């Protein structure tokens, strides 16, 4: 039987351990840091978590995170409404925004097709994307999904689905490492991939 800490400290370690990218040792380090941190720092963290759960929602139009819907991008009249960039997660929107190369709109799918994790097309925000393409305002859809197996499968699926709609479907140019996440791409590489996009 594995040894565990007593009560509240083990509960905190377990809670941190459920966060993505944090293993058991990292969770233990964070928990013990919080134990020795000033009380106001621990309170600030707890309040920030409660506040984000209470205030943050998903944009009714694009699926990005926001405090009120529509999000600032969808509400901005200066954005190019003829182009929609499709991404997996809200964090990908920020990665592309940091490049300062893109002035269109976004559509956040909420993931990618992944049969191993039981995520299929029905689990993604695909119907709302199709609804946004019903008019003739959108001329191009940019597939900016992670360059991994799941992202490629989702790009392929969406390209086939969108072909009959009559919009131009493009994808980011090469330059992003295969198997990586957009979140970790530097602004210059991502900006060049966006500027050099090609037909899907």
UniProtKB/Swiss-Prot annotation:
GO biological process: DNA recombination; DNA repair
PROSITE patterns: RECR, TOPRIM
Keyword Ribonucleoprotein: no
Residues of the Toprim domain: 82-177
MF annotations from Gene Ontology: DNA binding; zinc ion binding
ZnF (C4-type) intervals: 59-74
Top-level taxon of the source organism: Bacteria
Keyword Cell wall biogenesis/degradation carried by entry: no
Alphabetical keyword list: DNA damage, DNA recombination, DNA repair, Metal-binding, Zinc, Zinc-finger
SUPFAM superfamilies: Recombination protein RecR
InterPro entries in UniProt: DNA_Rcmb_RecR, Rcmb_RecR, Rcmb_RecR_Znf, TOPRIM_dom, TOPRIM_RecR
Pfam families named among the record's database cross-references: RecR_C, RecR_HhH, RecR_ZnF, Toprim_4
Summary of the function given for this chain in its UniProt record: May play a role in DNA repair. It seems to be involved in an RecBC-independent recombinational process of DNA repair. It may act with RecF and RecO.
Similarity comment: family membership: Belongs to the RecR family.
Protein name from the UniProt record: Recombination protein RecR
Taxonomic source organism: Bifidobacterium longum subsp. infantis (strain ATCC 15697 / DSM 20088 / JCM 1222 / NCTC 11817 / S12)
């Amino acid at each position: 039987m594995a040894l565990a800490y007593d009560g509240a400290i083990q509960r905190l370690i377990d809670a941190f351990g459920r966060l993505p990218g944090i293993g058991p040792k990292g969770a233990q380090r964070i928990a013990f840091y919080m134990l020795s941190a000033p009380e106001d720092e621990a309170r600030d963290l707890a309040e920030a978590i409660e506040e984000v759960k209470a205030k943050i929602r998903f944009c009714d139009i694009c699926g990005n995170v926001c405090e009120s819907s529509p999000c600032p991008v969808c509400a901005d009249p200066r954005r190019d409404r003829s182009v929609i960039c499709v991404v997996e997660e809200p964090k990908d929107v920020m990665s592309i925004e940091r490049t300062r190369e893109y002035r269109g709109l976004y559509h956040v799918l909420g993931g990618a097709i992944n049969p191993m994790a039981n995520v299929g097309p029905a689990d993604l925000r695909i119907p709302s994307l199709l609804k946004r393409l019903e008019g003739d305002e959108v001329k191009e859809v940019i597939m900016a999904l992670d360059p991994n197996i799941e992202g490629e499968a989702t790009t392929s699926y969406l390209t086939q689905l969108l072909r009959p709609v009559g919009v131009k479907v493009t994808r980011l140019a090469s330059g992003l490492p295969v198997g990586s996440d957009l979140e970790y791409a530097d602004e210059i590489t991502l900006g060049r991939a966006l500027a050099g996009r090609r037909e899907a």
